[in-house]
Amino acid sequence: MAFLASGRYLTHQQKVLRLYKRALRHLESWCVQRDKYRYFACLMRARFEEHKNEKDMAKATQLLKEAEEEFWYRQHPQPYIFPDSPGGTSYERYDCYKVPEWCLDDWHPSEKAMYPDYFAKREQWKKLRRESWEREVKQLQEETPPGGPLTEALPPARKEGDLPPLWWYIVTRPRERPM
């Protein structure tokens, strides 16, 4: 799974939905032919729909526990993992193709005109970055002791309305994959 939050923070509905999605993904690994997969997916959906409106939370929790145990015994030993998903064969392999953000400065105005909202927002970020750069560097110099570690996590903003130092790369991300 890409991200598994602690179970105590999920609502009952979220737990059921995640179990349903995991069960369908494992069913895809068992049923390669699409028509058979669809048939068994409909049967599984019907089983989940049977207890959709269960009012007694104790019974609903017990049903969820039993369903998770059944999933554990019926899960596929080698489930299909999409290549770009965490654990997939191509996960995070495209770092060499990620274009640095500054390359967008060289775009022709006609290219920028195709994405007016993005470039308008980008110009606002650039302006804010130019205005806050000196303050950010000064704050970092004040908070970093001489000879201290230079690789620590960045300190948070200290004043109301200020941005954390060197925030620029947090809010702008390169493309995930090449076109």
From Swiss-Prot:
Modified residues (Phosphoserine): 85
Coiled coil feature spans: none
Residues recorded as bearing N-acetylalanine in the entry: 2
Record-linked PANTHER family: NADH DEHYDROGENASE [UBIQUINONE] 1 BETA SUBCOMPLEX SUBUNIT 9, NADH-UBIQUINONE OXIDOREDUCTASE B22 SUBUNIT
Physiological role: Accessory subunit of the mitochondrial membrane respiratory chain NADH dehydrogenase (Complex I), that is believed to be not involved in catalysis. Complex I functions in the transfer of electrons from NADH to the respiratory chain. The immediate electron acceptor for the enzyme is believed to be ubiquinone.
Family of this protein: Belongs to the complex I LYR family.
Name of the protein described by the UniProt record: NADH dehydrogenase [ubiquinone] 1 beta subcomplex subunit 9
Organism whose genome encodes this protein: Gorilla gorilla gorilla (Western lowland gorilla)
Gene: NDUFB9
